[in-house]
Amino acid sequence: MQPRRQRLPAPWSGPRGPRPTAPLLALLLLLAPVAAPAGSGDPDDPGQPQDAGVPRRLLQQAARAALHFFNFRSGSPSALRVLAEVQEGRAWINPKEGCKVHVVFSTERYNPESLLQEGEGRLGKCSARVFFKNQKPRPTINVTCTRLIEKKKRQQEDYLLYKQMKQLKNPLEIVSIPDNHGHIDPSLRLIWDLAFLGSSYVMWEMTTQVSHYYLAQLTSVRQWKTNDDTIDFDYTVLLHELSTQEIIPCRIHLVWYPGKPLKVKYHCQELQTPEEASGTEEGSAVVPTELSNF
């Protein structure tokens, strides 16, 4: 039996009143007149440049999509980044093709409890080109980031986390991370970070120009014993989609070993309006871990 789509609990519901559920209303919200600095037009792009200013929500949407892609491609729980601030950007709109966004933004380490060496800053900087194909998911992304954790240090941190997982006497079977009070036990932080790593692929694949997801909760985790050295586990996540305030259950299977390609398979209930029939989305991926921007 497939998990049923769930409404967001009251604490997450925001201000009272009707919420936009249709993609058109979500697009209008995204394009509200909150502007960031705009650049000049792209001479090679047939679309129309946004001369008067680019909606900040669109730049943030592009930056978050780029980070989902970047985190998944990194294959490293120690390298996870989140958006700190959008610094500048520009966009071109082609009604037939979609929207192309160039955005520059700063990032910070996803796990604020990670130990920092003296002189090591939390912030990094990224530049991304993101192409939203109208309302289709899985935007095309080219992203480069700098001022990140050194490769050697990242590998050391990943291996320490890996050893902690392998030293467990019994495979994990966990329910609800974080708990109902929003707390993540320090002993479960690695599981959460690995789940975030795999979920980044799912969130990138499901993202559109108006839909944005973040990881709300793990509702189940099951680690499997393997005959090789990999970490292999299944987990169910609840993804929060902001424009519709929907919660989407996804079952994800992840195989991880430090320095090796990350393997992800998933099966999600499709985001839909109440008038639409039920559906599912699924996919899988294996990615390289050697990236030019590390």
Curated annotation (Swiss-Prot):
Compartmental location: Membrane; Secreted
Tissue specificity: Detected in urine (at protein level).
UniProt keyword list: Glycoprotein, Membrane, Protease inhibitor, Proteoglycan, Repeat, Secreted, Signal-anchor, Transmembrane, Transmembrane helix
Stretches for region Disordered: 273-294
Keyword Secreted among record annotations: yes
Bilayer topology term: Single-pass type III membrane protein
Induction conditions: By tazarotene and by all the retinoic acid receptors tested.
GO MF annotations, alphabetized: metalloendopeptidase inhibitor activity
A Pfam family per the record: LXN
Residues modified by glycosylation: S40
PROSITE patterns with a match to the protein in the record: CYSTATIN_LXN
GO CC annotations, alphabetized: extracellular exosome; extracellular space; membrane
Modification note: Not N-glycosylated. O-glycosylated; contains chondroitin sulfate.
Disulfide bond is among the record's keywords: no
Main location: membrane
GO-annotated biological processes: negative regulation of cell population proliferation
Self-association state and partner proteins as the record states: Interacts with AGBL2, KIF11 and MAPRE1.
Family listed: Belongs to the protease inhibitor I47 (latexin) family.
Entry function: Inhibitor of the cytoplasmic carboxypeptidase AGBL2, may regulate the alpha-tubulin tyrosination cycle.
Protein's name in the database: Retinoic acid receptor responder protein 1
